[in-house]
Amino acid sequence: MVVDGKTTRLRASCNACNESKVRCSQRKPTCARCERNGVECIYGLSRRTHKDAPPISMPPSQRSHNHPRGASRSSSSGGDTKANSNSSSNWHMSPNVPFMIPPQQQQQQQKEEAAAAAAATPRFQCMYTPQDATADTVNRAGLLLDMDFSSLVTGSSSPLTSVDPLSAAVTRFPTPGAEHTNPWALGPFFGGNTNNNSINNPDWTRQPTTMGPMITVPTTAPPSPSPSCTECSCHAGVTELLSSMRGGGDDRRLSLDAQLAKLKRCIVSSETSMGCAHGRDDAEPIHILAVSTLIGYVIDEFEMLASESPLRLSSSLADMSGSRNAERVAESILSSGSDESMSMSSMAATTGVNNMSMSMSMGNLLEPRLSWGVLELEDDDEVDLRQRLYLLSFRKLERLLSQLTIYLRNLHDARAGLPEPSRHMAFVMACDYTRLWLEKKAEDVKRMFLVARPAGDETMDPALMFTAH
């Protein structure tokens, strides 16, 4: 800055007191550097005693000779003079301050004011606490730098008095009202004002922040959902079982006890899903299709048991005895014949027989035997008991089909009373046709169980007998 032909460089603090914040006193403070140069110091102009001081940006010819406001300093080289003259163009003029502020002093003041505000303000306080009215204007210049806050508070659209690099970001968005931009009204910010929603109001998100880093304000916790709005878990069992049955082939290698336990679980999960009361009255119960699919899997498993159960154990015992006879025949062929081709074929036959016998023995080890305490059941009795267990489990399946029929009948009556019944009856008809298909499959499996009943068993419990519909 050039004043009266002399170049001066102002520091952020005075050499005499080494303080950047100089309060007003009886006499105007003067730094030692200005006294050494024989000029009047312009550092720390007192707001109380120098209100009539002319702006520094005013040319020296227009200033009063009684109140010089400049400071000069001898420059050691022409490079310093050029650098200082170029740096003077980077100074900013605040519209509310009657003099210019050097960038070094602005940065120092902003750092000190931010530290003082952080130490004095409580947690989550976003705004700067105003100082006393007698404070120096220079100390508050950082708050008024680069933009006119009065236009934001009052809602006026007066242009800024200086070229502001942040003016584009400020004037790009509409200016909010005074009730939203009052920096001391934190009621709406913390939920005190219920009329203005800070989340739905775009002006809050667009307002520029010049007081420092943005502080996240904790929002109110969302209301806890009511019990009726919670997620329903009545259909989780059906979904899990359908996912596990997609392989298909692995389930057929389960033992009989594990197979019956899984079928019972499928029936119970289907009953739980049909008894769910969390659905809406106007929504279509899509879960009934998943229940119908699971019932179809159960019928397929019962069909497999009905086709394999009557002679399962007896056939395995017969295969074991047949394998032993085949081994004896192979041994006799090996001992009597010397032909190479015959020996090779007999060795292949022996290997196949051994593999079959090993697989059958492993299957018998995996298959649990029925017993009653210390009583060892005979093979025929065990086959008969297994058959009765299948029939008891199949009775539960028929009861599930009856519940499905009642459920669809109630659904038909409920949808018939709606304003547009034709729009809902298509879904009911699809479910009803699926039910008819399942009942037809169940009847076929039931006939297989009746045909596979052990011969000579005329004393079967009538409760286990099934009559055709």
From Swiss-Prot:
Record's subcellular location: Nucleus
Residue ranges of the annotated DNA-binding region, renumbered to this chain: 14-41
Region (Disordered) residue spans: 49-118
Alphabetical UniProt keywords: DNA-binding, Metal-binding, Nucleus, Transcription, Transcription regulation, Virulence, Zinc
Composition bias type Polar residues, residue spans: 82-93
Pfam families hit by this protein: Zn_clus (PF00172)
Biased composition (Low complexity): 104-118
Main location: nucleus
A single Gene Ontology CC term: nucleus
Stretches assigned to coiled coil: none
Any one GO molecular-function label of the UniProt entry: DNA-binding transcription factor activity, RNA polymerase II-specific
SUPFAM superfamilies in UniProt: Zn2/Cys6 DNA-binding domain
Described function: Transcription factor; part of the gene cluster that mediates the biosynthesis of the phomopsins, a group of hexapeptide mycotoxins which infects lupins and causes lupinosis disease in livestock. May play a role in the regulation of the production of phomopsins.
Protein name, entry field: Transcription factor phomD
The organism's taxonomic lineage, starting at the top: Eukaryota, Fungi, Dikarya, Ascomycota, Pezizomycotina
Gene assigned in the entry: phomD
